[in-house]
Amino acid sequence: MQAAAISVRCNGPMGDEKAMKIYSFGEETKPAILLLPGTCCHWKRNFGHVIPLLQEHFYVLCTSYDGFDETEDSTFPNMLIETAKLENYIQKNLGGQLFAAYGCSLGGSFVGLMVQRKKIHIRHGILGSSDLDQGSSFGTWAMAKAMTPLLGKMLRSGKLPVWAKKKMEEKAGAEYAQAMLQLFGCSAATQELPSMAFVSNTSIFNQFFSDMVTPLEDDIYVSGTKIHCFYAVKMGEEYENRYRRHFVDPDIRYHAMQHEELLACYPEQWVEEVLASCRLDGRGMEENDFEERHFTEAERAQAEITESGNPRKPEGEDGKKMLERMNESHHNVTGWALSLWEIQGNDNILDIGCGGGAALSRMAEH
C-alpha cells in the first residue's frame, strides 16, 4: 500500500497553522473519497484493510488528524480547526468539490460539519455508525477529564484491561471485540498497525471534548448532497432518530450489527455498501446523474395512493401491447424453469418480482 502524504494548512484566524497530513492512493482521475477516522484512531488501523479495495473505484484520500500521526509533532486542536483544514485541502486540490466522504464514528461529525458549513460541496456524505453525541460543556468536560487518562494508558500499553476485554467479548462476541481493539490500537504493533503510544493526553482530551460540544445543527440540507447513514441496529433506535433529526431525508442503511462492525469485520461488504451509497457501477462512474428530491406532505400522500394502485401498470394501447409482451416473456421463462423442476403439490413458490412467482403458480396448476 503506497501513499503520497500531502500536508494541508488551515486558513482563517483560528490560530493553528500547523500542517495536517492527508494520504492519497490511486488514480486522481477517479472520483475522490475522503476517509475520516474515528475517536483516537490511526488512519492505517482504521482504513488500511479497505483502502486497496476502494482504490479500484476511487481516488482515496485518508485523513490523519493532528496529534494522531506518528510522523508529526502536533496536537489535536479542536473540531472546527480540523474541519477548516479539510475544507482548505478540498478547495485547493479538488476545486471545492468532493465526490464522497466516509466518516467512521467521530469522522461522521466531520462529515456533518463540512456539509453544514457549506464552504465546500460533498456529493455523498456517509456516516459510519456515528453516535453524534452532544452534551453540555461542564458535563462533557468532567467526562473527558475522567476518560482521558484511561484512554491514554490504553493507547500507550496497546492493551485493554482484562476485565474490560472480557466484558466486551461477552457482550459483542470475541471476533468483533478483537477487530475493534485492533482498529482502536489495542493490539500488537506492526508496520501496518502502528503503535499509538505517541498520542498525548492533550490530543485525546481535545478530540473527545470538542467533538461533543461542537454543535451539529438539525435539519441539515444542501442541494445536490445526499447523506447516507450506516445504521448499526444493535446500537439502538435513538441513533436512527438522531440521523433523522440532524439531516433532511437521510438514506438510512440498516445493518443488524454493532458499532462499525461492518467496516471492522466485513471489509468486502463494507465496500459494496459504499459503492451502493454512491451509486457506482463498479467502474468508478455513476450509473445515473444524482438528483436530490424532497417531497411535500401532499406529494407524499399522493405517492402512497399511487403505490397502492400499482403505479407500474401500463395504460392505453401501448400499455396493452407491453403487457402482452411481458406475459409472453413470463410464460417462456417459467416454462423453462418448470422443465428443470418438477413441482409437487405442497411446494411453496417464491415470487421474485415482475410477476414471475404468479406466472409459476398459474402454470403449475396445469
What are these regions (language model features)?
Residues 356-366:
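Conserved SAM-binding loop of SAM-dependent methyltransferases across substrates and taxa
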Residues 25-70:
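Conserved HGGG/HGGXW glycine-rich cap/lid loop of the alpha/beta-hydrolase fold
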Residues 328-347:
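Conserved alpha-helix/loop element of class I SAM-dependent methyltransferases that forms part
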Residues 99-136:
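Conserved hydrolase catalytic core segment
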Residues 257-269:
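Catalytic histidine-centered segment of alpha/beta-hydrolase-like enzymes
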Residues 62-99:
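Active-site loop/oxyanion-hole signature of alpha/beta-hydrolase fold enzymes
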Residues 125-155:
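Flexible "cap/lid" loop of the alpha/beta hydrolase fold
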Residues 199-242:
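Conserved serine/cysteine hydrolase catalytic core
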